[in-house]
């Protein structure tokens, strides 16, 4: 009798993707983050759904509806903080996943990589519009400042901003449409993630050595299902610890003050996961230049496969490239710190130097050092 798992049209797809999938035998825990991102997405959609049942996307009631969720809804505070801190966990996994791709040369699967960059942009958009919904001070001013960046676009900028706002300032129309975007985008992310997976399974996974592993594959289940479950337990434990012991650790106290267009907060800043890009934006004293640098800081990922000059795919056996990679990580952490600081000396100059180093490392140093490594290996 044929196994239904391998013959039924629906289970066959699942079987080929998660059970009998041939997987390299040597992939490390850095390969866990893909499944953890899937778990984060499911958790965010579920908690978000329950929050949407009680939230009202109207300027006069949005803030109080969030307070109502936290005070009056059964376990509403728990759902709300799971959702808020779940976003932080999502970005931690996302950045680790991208870092893994950069280190081990996974970007050489170009379709998978490009869909991944598109996914990153979509997740960032979702997080941004979601941050506006509680309608606190930082929600309102964050929305005002970031949407205003589009006014730097020559000729059509101002019209574009007013079109997005649905008026002459961030108001009711803006909040309503941002709620609509925040509701629909996760489903678009889910569809893109399926395409991401589809392209990945066309080529099979990369592995830490960067050498083709066709001759040494093992089935995904049970070897990697059990490994993914362990990763999931760590993720859930961290999320629960954060949610139950320090729910506001990563948030901004200003967002507990209702939005007031007449009072600007002393320091307008986004959530921690956008601070590196915000620091790059602020480091350029020209508005259009800042916006372009902000865009390029993310879109530079698309050009990574074109900047590959090494004859080896992975950085596993390339100590000089490893040094530059960890310098890049340190630089990003510096930018994240700078993004949360006020615009004054010495933070301005540190931010500018860190921004220059970020682009210089990716566009110049890493490709050059890769060529030197080729020479040293007589390739």
From Swiss-Prot:
Heme b b562 binds at residues 83, 182. The gene is MT-CYB. The keyword Ligase does not apply. It comes from Cephalorhynchus commersonii. Its main location: mitochondrion. This is Cytochrome b. Keywords: Electron transport, Heme, Iron, Membrane, Metal-binding, Mitochondrion, Mitochondrion inner membrane, Respiratory chain, Transmembrane, Transmembrane helix, Transport, Ubiquinone. Belongs to the cytochrome b family. It is a multi-pass membrane protein. Its cofactor is heme b.
């Amino acid at each position: 009798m044929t196994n239904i798992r391998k013959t039924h049209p629906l289970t066959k797809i699942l079987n080929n993707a998660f059970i009998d999938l041939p997987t390299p035998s040597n992939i490390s825990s850095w390969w866990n983050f893909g499944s953890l991102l899937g778990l984060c997405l499911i958790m965010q959609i579920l908690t978000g759904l329950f929050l949407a049942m009680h939230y009202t996307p109207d300027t006069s009631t949005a803030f109080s509806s969030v307070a109502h969720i936290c005070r009056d809804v059964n376990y509403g505070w728990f759902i709300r903080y799971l959702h808020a801190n779940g976003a932080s966990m999502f970005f931690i996994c996302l950045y680790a996943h991208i870092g893994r791709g950069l280190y081990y040369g996974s970007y050489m699967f170009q379709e998978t990589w490009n869909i991944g960059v598109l996914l990153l942009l979509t997740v960032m958009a979702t997080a941004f519009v979601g941050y506006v919904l509680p309608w606190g001070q930082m929600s309102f001013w964050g929305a005002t400042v970031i949407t205003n960046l589009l006014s730097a676009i020559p000729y059509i900028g101002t019209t574009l901003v007013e079109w997005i706002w649905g008026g002459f300032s961030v108001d009711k129309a803006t909040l309503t449409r941002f709620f609509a975007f925040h509701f629909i985008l996760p489903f678009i992310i889910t569809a893109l993630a399926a395409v991401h997976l589809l392209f990945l399974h066309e080529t099979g996974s990369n592995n830490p050595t960067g050498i083709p592993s066709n001759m040494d594959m093992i089935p995904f289940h049970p070897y990697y299902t059990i490994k993914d479950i362990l990763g999931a337990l760590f993720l859930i434990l961290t999320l629960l610890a954060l949610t139950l012991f320090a729910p506001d650790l990563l948030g901004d106290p200003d967002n507990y003050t209702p939005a007031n267009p007449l009072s600007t907060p002393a320091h307008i800043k986004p959530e921690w996961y956008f601070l590196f890009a915000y620091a790059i934006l602020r480091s350029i004293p020209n508005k259009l230049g800042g916006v372009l640098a902000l865009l390029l800081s993310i879109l530079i990922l698309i050009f990574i496969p074109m900047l590959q000059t090494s004859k080896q795919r992975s950085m596993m056996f390339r100590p000089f490239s490893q040094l530059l990679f960890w310098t890049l990580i340190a630089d990003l952490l510096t930018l994240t710190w700078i993004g949360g600081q006020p615009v004054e000396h010495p933070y301005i100059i540190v931010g500018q130097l860190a921004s220059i180093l970020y682009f210089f490392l990716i566009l110049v140093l890493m490709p050059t050092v890769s060529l030197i490594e080729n020479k040293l290996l007589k390739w």
